[in-house]
Design a protein with these regions (language model features):
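Charged catalytic and DNA/RNA-contacting regions of genome-maintenance
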Residues: 1-252
Length: 255
């Protein structure tokens, strides 16, 4: 624990090192408290669920990714709590490493029973991504569908383009559950979800991005000296994020 005024100094360091941080605040005036002052956890900050200006690079999305496997099909759902972006889709399980490289998440959620299968795949792609194990009952279709329809205030998921994605819905439910738990349900701006088609983009694997120094320099891993640092003359955070998406995964659409 540390004083509230030291939060901005310690929180970024802890989260960037992969720690989960529970922010606890006093809920009553110490002068009027009987005994120990009442305190409650008001927010849980993790690498994939952060909204603080001190932690985020606002020209880069901070994605939380959930992965669920069933019969060689991988359901993937990624979100950015700071922007309200929320997607879900399915691929063959052999394509998981490529998709992790495309999304570049800060944190990945997996079911406890699938950790042994997914952890080696994730770590082979990147050693720096935080892997969080979630209770298996959360990765179920009925729970995921109920949670999503309640969040979007709808009777079904028709119209979002994911109603036939069983594994995708399971992954999206786990993603949303994690956001609700860490943000204490303060996620009303997350009001829609959409499908995602990775075949619409030319995907570059991690080693190619590294060797071409597209988004980071090989010398120190920083942004300076990379292609994006030269191209980026955007004036807003949204513009910076959009440019990074275009450079990292070029659209296959020809106009």
């Amino acid at each position: 624990g540390f004083p509230h005024h030291a939060l901005d100094a310690y929180l970024p360091k802890l989260v960037r090192n992969g720690y989960r941080v529970a922010v606890c605040e006093q809920m009553e005036n110490p002068k009027f408290a009987k005994g120990i002052v009442k305190r409650e956890v008001v927010e849980v900050v993790t690498p994939g669920v952060a909204i603080s200006d001190k932690i985020l690079d606002h020209k880069k999305n901070n994605y939380l990714l959930a992965i669920y496997l069933e019969n060689e099909i991988a359901g993937l759902s990624f979100s950015d709590i700071s922007t309200g972006e929320f997607h879900s889709y399915e691929v063959h399980q052999n394509d998981i490493p490529q998709q992790i490289g495309l999304i570049n998440p800060s944190e990945i959620l997996v079911a406890k029973k699938q950790k042994g299968i997914l952890e080696p795949v994730i770590q082979k792609t990147s050693q720096s991504i935080t892997i969080t194990k979630i209770d298996d009952w959360i990765f179920t279709f009925d729970y995921g569908e109920e949670l999503l329809t309640k969040q979007f205030n709808t009777l079904s998921l028709k119209g979002f383009g994911i109603e036939n994605l069983r594994c995708g819905i399971i992954a999206a439910g786990a993603n949303l559950n994690y956001l609700r738990e860490t943000q204490k349900e303060n996620i009303s701006h997350l009001n829609k979800i959409s499908g995602y088609n990775p075949s619409d983009y030319m995907v570059l694997d991690f080693s190619t991005k590294r060797n071409l120094e597209i988004t980071f320099s090989m010398s120190d891993g920083g942004r300076e000296g990379s292609l994006i640092s030269i191209l980026d003359h955007t004036q807003t955070a949204m513009g910076g994020r959009m440019l990074k998406k275009w450079v990292s995964a070029r659209s296959e659409e020809h106009t």
